[in-house]
């Protein structure tokens, strides 16, 4: 019923041009589904007095672990609600960002980046929500404003990403493991194609034009290509779907339940304090507690449990229990640039009216999903370019056949937190005149800039401090400018010119003191238009045996604590040369 209402109302309101009303209705429907799931989850789940294992988080890694773990006496905890069927429609991705299905984290103000964003903050990805309070025992705990695309639902961030399946190369991981045997086991995941649910997605003329232009510049078909997506019959297929399809639902699963603290007994992780349905409950595990709460969530949970840098914990009023200096450190993220940088002379038939047209909807639900743009995950082509470093690739290019002006400024500009003045000066004229913009993002795969995550207070419900230190390395800025220069070469090739692709000639606000197209101008542009690609890693770094340099050993056991593991993207010592979702699966394996 919700799906029928969704498409019928969307079709009506977008056809008559009421973008804001259409997005508002979509938001209301997702909220109704959210609260329906929440009310359903309020029915008490019978819980065992003790479990073999408790998995904290049902995202990419957590759901994979749950589907593979041999024990049946397992509890899976999820802070958000269960997902709904509309989440399986890939094109609805932007509508989920900034909703109750998203943690909505926000970074600290960035001195060297995000100059075009409000308060120089990067939203990961979406806007503020009103403070609310929940009753937990005798306490009133505020939920502070936060934003960042980090999935808060069964399926985790895999529900909110572009579904690109990256087949990693061994060269990316050679320094991660102390023993060659451990690296061999890790690489088996990719070499044996343990994740088989991948398909080529919907594409427009733009993706083909960029790929063909790259061929003319001498790049190979293994460098620019249409990516594989984690879909099944055109629908989003996550590790949570896989978990359920394998019949592992014998495990207990508790949603809308936030872990407050890990309780240690003589150095052994035995208990969790969890807020669920307005109550504080205690859960016990006899063999292990596995943190799979993500790069922000896992580090934050360790810190608020007293596991982390002693002095920093004491500063915010948390009693240190295990001194692990590297918890929350080593934060790395893929960043890109280039929204509304390219204009296109031809329509790609991705106007909202085209998307919700009955024939397009019918194709998706009748099995002709590859002909329906509803199966489109956002990215229709990728490219990988080496700048001469030791890595396989230094830059990635993501080809997106739309821009921030595609919805008339109703929703997308809020996702990236654009300043109102910047929108009115640079973006709104494109929207007002009907010019079409597309996006080809140069993305820095191995940034030198490194940040950290910390606690704001001893209150576990307060949003964490997230400071990625974007573009504090001048080398990062230079490499992104090189990416823009490569993009200029691509747009000058015949396949791109036939589509009418050209660079936006309007100087970007705040950069007009520099000559347009000079390196100094593009350096200013990169520092202004700085986009997270939503791939943070590294805050619970794994590796060697020294607790001073890493958080866990290569077998994912937290140093100084028995029966406590971290198994998600937070353990990655460095960023892979591509989208890390598949790497998180391999960590779970």
Question: Where are the regions that the model predicts?
Answer:
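N-terminal redox-cofactor-binding region of secreted/periplasmic oxidoreductases
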Residues: 2-589
């Amino acid at each position: 019923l919700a799906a029928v209402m969704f498409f019928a109302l969307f079709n009506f309101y977008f056809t008559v041009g009421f973008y804001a009303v259409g997005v508002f209705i979509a938001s209301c429907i997702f909220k109704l589904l959210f609260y329906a799931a929440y009310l359903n989850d309020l029915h008490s789940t019978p819980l065992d007095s003790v479990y073999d294992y408790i998995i904290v988080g049902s995202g990419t890694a957590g759901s994979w672990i749950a589907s593979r773990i041999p024990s049946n006496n397992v509890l899976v905890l999820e802070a958000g609600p269960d997902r709904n069927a509309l989440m399986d429609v890939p094109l609805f991705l932007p509508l989920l960002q900034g909703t109750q299905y998203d943690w909505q984290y926000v970074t600290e103000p960035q001195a060297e980046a995000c100059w075009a964003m409000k308060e120089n903050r990067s939203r990961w990805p979406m806007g503020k929500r009103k403070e609310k309070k929940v009753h937990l025992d005798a306490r009133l705990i505020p939920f502070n404003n936060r934003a960042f695309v980090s999935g808060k639902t069964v399926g985790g961030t895999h529900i909110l990403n572009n579904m690109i399946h990256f087949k990693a190369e061994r060269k990316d991981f050679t320094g991660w493991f102390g023993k060659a045997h451990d690296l061999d086991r890790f690489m088996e995941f990719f070499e044996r194609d343990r994740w088989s649910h991948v398909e080529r997605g919907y594409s427009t003329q733009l993706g083909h034009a960029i790929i063909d232009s790259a061929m003319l510049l001498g790049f190979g078909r293994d460098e620019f290509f249409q990516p594989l997506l984690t879909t099944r019959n055109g629908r989003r297929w996550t590790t949570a779907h896989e978990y359920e399809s394998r019949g592992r639902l014998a495990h207990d699963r508790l949603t809308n339940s936030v872990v407050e603290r890990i309780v240690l007994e003589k150095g052994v992780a035995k208990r969790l304090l969890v807020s669920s349905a307005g109550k504080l409950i205690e859960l016990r595990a006899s063999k292990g507690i596995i943190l799979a709460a993500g790069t922000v969530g896992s580090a934050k949970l360790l810190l608020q449990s007293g596991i982390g840098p002693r002095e920093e914990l004491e500063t915010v009023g948390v009693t240190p229990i295990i001194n692990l200096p590297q918890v929350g450190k080593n934060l790395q993220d893929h960043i890109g640039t280039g929204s509304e940088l390219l204009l296109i002379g031809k329509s790609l038939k991705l106007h909202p009216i085209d998307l919700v047209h009955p024939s397009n909807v019918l194709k998706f639900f009748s099995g002709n999903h590859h002909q329906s743009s509803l199966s489109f995950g956002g990215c229709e082509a990728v490219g990988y370019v080496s700048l001469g470093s030791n890595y396989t690739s230094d830059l990635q290019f993501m080809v997106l056949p739309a821009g921030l002006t595609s919805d008339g400024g109703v929703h997308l500009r809020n996702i990236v937190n654009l300043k109102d003045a910047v929108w009115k000066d640079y973006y709104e004229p494109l929207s007002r005149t009907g010019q079409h913009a597309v996006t080809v993002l140069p993305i820095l795969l191995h940034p030198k800039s490194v940040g950290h995550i910390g606690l704001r207070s001893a209150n576990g419900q307060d949003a964490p401090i997230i400071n990625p230190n974007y573009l504090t390395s001048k080398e990062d800025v230079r490499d992104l400018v090189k990416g823009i220069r490569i993009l200029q070469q691509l747009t000058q090739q015949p396949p791109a010119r036939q589509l009418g692709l050209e660079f936006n000639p309007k100087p970007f606000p705040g950069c007009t003191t520099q000559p347009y197209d000079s390196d100094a101008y593009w350096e200013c542009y990169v520092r202004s238009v700085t986009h997270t690609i939503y791939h943070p890693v590294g805050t619970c770094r794994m590796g060697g045996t020294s607790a001073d340099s890493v958080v866990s050993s290569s077998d994912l056991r937290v140093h100084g604590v028995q029966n406590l593991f971290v198994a998600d993207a937070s353990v990655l010592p460095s960023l892979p040369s591509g989208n890390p979702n598949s790497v998180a699966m391999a960590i779970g394996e």
